[in-house]
Amino acid sequence: MTKRPSPTGEYAVGTFTYTVNTNRDDALAPGHKRNIPARVYYPVLKESVADLTMAKYMTENMAIGLKKTMHVPVNFKKADAEGDNFSECYENAPKIEGKKFPLIMFNHGLLSFREGNSFLCIELASKGYVVISVGHPYDAVCTEFDDGTYVFAMKGIQNKQYEPMLGGFFNAYKLIKYNGDNRELAEKFEELQQNYCAFVRSRISEWEKDTMNAIDYAKENLSDMIDFEPGIAACGHSLGGATAYMLCFDKPEIVCGINIDGAPFGENHGRIQEKPFLQISCTGNLKAETRVFIDHKAPAYSVVFRDMAHVGFSDMKHMIKFNSLTGKLDADLMHENLCNCFTEFFDTYLKNTKEKPDIQSNDVITVTEYAPDAE
């Protein structure tokens, strides 16, 4: 856990957690109700944290979950003993009295965890946003609740991406090799998800409900720090990004969204997107992610990163050195460009302080804006 980026905004960052106890039956844990943990990152004055200790980055249970499910070698005991297990934020730091900030909802990817994209969330909070990262029990490598309990991922979940697995992988490979325009590729992906991805599709609606449970809590309990007037932004990595795309269809209070390298699973075929949306991709996954660029009334953007792999868009880029998982691109370059995409987009479509996001192609990213193509 040695290398981590520091936030660059005008604010320091506070953090705390909450758990929503719902009455929803949990399909992944029969006989149990689904409880939703969330972590809040929020702007605080830098002088208010001068004497505070930084929050822990990871618990031992989370390290066990990463190793157990994803085989990620996190030496928790060594990092903790050497003082390297910290996050660039402060537990329960004093809120800024009389100041409210717009809300961004973040959803992690399947078999990630609530703090798995914390570097991005912390940067956004330092730029004047409240960010709530939602945990998804049994879908994450480990999910921790405020009463001290925790659950690991559902057994065998890593084998349910495609059903049957062999046929799904074969057809996903055919999609990546297929040469077609954005609409043709989107239709090929729709065939793939309908024929082989029933489990993954079923999780989208549950994750939407998880997100709305977390939002309802925030509306009831955090209105002193959150400005709900401009609406709410949704974003996420992988399946969390697909959830953000569906939230933009389904929930009026969600006004814009960003998907980090997530294929657009969900019941979106033939629907018209009316919210501004940004799709971030690595080159290897772009052909599975073209749905965002068709059937939209609002601006749609594509940002494609060179030399990146899927897992590298999370904190893991700074923690492990497996190029096949995280890509060859320098971790700091990835983080800088990713954060710029987010701040430019949300400053435009959530804060409404800009006319248009200033996201330019460079030697790391290729940017395309798609004009609305639907009435």
Each language-model region and where it sits:
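Primarily recognizes the serine-hydrolase "nucleophile elbow" in alpha/beta-hydrolase
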Residues: 213-272
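Alpha/beta-hydrolase active-site loop
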Residues: 141-225
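Domain-level recognition of soluble alpha/beta enzyme cores
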Residues: 1-104
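Divalent metal-coordination and catalytic microenvironments
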Residues: 40, 124, 211, 232, ...
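Short substrate-entry loop that stabilizes the transition state in hydrolases
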Residues: 80-144, 266, 285-287
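The feature captures the conserved acid-bearing segment of alpha/beta-hydrolase catalytic domains
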Residues: 255-315
